[in-house]
Amino acid sequence: MTESWLGRILELEVGPVAHGGHCVSRVDGRVLFVRHALPGERVRAEVTEDKGGSFCRADAIEVLSGSEHRVTPPCPLAAPGGCGGCDWQHAEPAYQRELKAAVVAEQLQRLAGITRDVVVEPLEGGPLGWRSRVRLVAGRDGQAGLRAHHSHRVVQIDDCPIAVPGSLDTALSKRWRPGTELEVTSDGENHLHLRELATVRGRTQGKQLSGGMAIQHAAGRDWRLDAHGFWQVHPQAADTLAELVREWAAAPRGGVAWDLYAGVGLFASVLADQVGPDGQVLAIESGRRAVSDGERNLADLPQVSWRSGRVEHLIGDAPTPVDVVVLDPPRKGAGRAVVNAIAEGEPDRIVYVACDPAALARDVQFFSEHGYSLTDLRAFDAFPMTHHVECVALLQ
């Protein structure tokens, strides 16, 4: 068995960025995924994870030759051994977007065989103070903090520069039972909602400590919903995505549309406006609370019908023929079975909202097997300072 490299210090030439936010380097036939580095740099790195095999992970602990795009992180904890939340605070914001664009383009080429230039667009508001939902955990001293990267270790914080300003003050000012997990949400009215989390029989449950019903604004509507249910964490993301879905879906008057992985019905509301009272919109969502919130918020749109359950279990009963399908699957993507079921409905247009470029590329390849082509794609920096990127793809 090969001797473990864990803890080993290596001098590395850093290569391109990889999916997941690490940069790639190679030593003695092995691949190293390096955090806190940038392409083209020369660094000293400490191996932080080695499970054997062809790759391991490392942190850049000293920059020997830095990139012109390197900056001082706005948070001192965005460093080796610090908080695990941000990946690229050490890069200029514009360069962060270039790195994300490179990842999206590489995944499309590698997994879908598509060569395409990608531009990641910034959202209004800048790279700090945008995160409206934060999960904290209490350390041994009862002080709430954030977890280190790939670790249960709690890093104590005084604040978080990417969080909505002031949103963490209450949680950080108190002492909690060690191990307590907390979720803080700031809604569209800047109301704060604090929940204590617990895992019971493998399911996350919450005890509301303050707030509870959030008010959000998007797609020309006011939304009243569970503060801790799914909603885009960037304040500008929901409206940006809804308007692009409106443009690309172009559902015909009196037509049929599906909104898959519908959440509370943000995109269903857009589709309902397009098809009108004589059309049909089917919204499928597995979260029961989200369905309840969606039914209440869209009660004025009788053309929207809701189904609660997993998309792969319910899509077979969806009304056909369908004119347009919008889907916003979880990070793992829709998968071949759901793609096949969508294709059987023969929609003219498919609008795919994706939070993971690899899953998007795999599903685009599955759609291509049914004759669908990627005709447009836009990407948004809905998660500044992290490696995450939100994409919207149009397939026809």
What are these regions (language model features)?
Residues 1-327, 332-340, 346:
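Accessory RNA-recognition modules of RNA-modification enzymes
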Residues 307-389:
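S-adenosylmethionine
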